[in-house]
Amino acid sequence: MLNPFQLLFYSQLLASLTYFIGAAIYALPVPVYGVKKWAPRLITDSIYVVVWNSIYLGVLLFLGELLSLLGVTWDGYFSWLNNILYIEQSLYLMVKTILTASNAVPEVSALIQVVPFGALLTVITSALTFTSTLIAVSKIVYQYVAVFIATGVLFLSIPFRIGRSVGGAFIGSGIVFYVGLPYLPQFLAAFQMLPTQELNTPPQNASAIIDYYVHVVPSIITSLVIGPVIYIFILVGFSMGVASLVSGYGSRLPLIIDVF
């Protein structure tokens, strides 16, 4: 596992190199604006990286405080995801059993003519794949958020702003997804898209199966696929905004530093 403090150490070295390059460009006896303009930029970039190194631990503590203010925890979020995964696996097993029994039981075979269980199985499989992927991504964000931010600072420290956009993307994604992902259940609840208790109650007869398909399948699609996907896209948008803020706009940095 990468050590975030080692990454910050390397970023500090690169920041020092960037500063000395800027100072050297200032001292060049070449009155060419295209060259001289890099001197203040490099010096401000190096100071900006030093600021990020200084507030690194404070940023991590601030993220924890944001989670507390939102009233969410990663443990609760993972518990919710595992419960969703259990529901999807139960639904998959139920539909798979019905499809298997259709070859031997005429009543079940007739039921399949009414209810398109093949399409239902495809929907459940898609939801199962999405939830499994979301769990894997969430674990990566939870375990490596410190590394993401430190890697972003390292890219910010590369001279001549070569890695500025990449560094901003690492920092923005780490911050937004670490705070935003655990809020997914609350987001779905706010728009009444949480999985209903009916999803966890398998039907007992043919008429119940038809009713289950008519009323519950839309809930499967909205609560297990559409809702989470919309929320992920919202987080992506926020992370892009934070990335732009961190890396600056055009030739400007978000930190106001005057270098003469």
From Swiss-Prot:
Effect of inactivating the gene: DNA transfer is completely abolished in deletion mutants. Deletion does not reduce cellular aggregation induced by UV stress.
Assembly mode: Forms a complex composed of CedA, CedA1 and CedA2.
Primary location class: membrane
Function: Part of the Ced system, which is involved in DNA import.
Encoding gene (name): cedA
Induction annotation: Up-regulated upon UV stress.
Subcellular location: Cell membrane
GO-annotated cellular components: plasma membrane
The name this protein goes by in its record: DNA import protein CedA
Membrane-traversing stretches: 13-33, 47-67, 110-130, 140-160, 169-189, 220-240
Membrane topology reported for the UniProt record: Multi-pass membrane protein
Record-linked InterPro entries: CedA_arc
Keywords: Cell membrane, Membrane, Transmembrane, Transmembrane helix, Transport
Organism, scientific name: Sulfolobus acidocaldarius (strain ATCC 33909 / DSM 639 / JCM 8929 / NBRC 15157 / NCIMB 11770)
The UniProt record lists the keyword Membrane: yes
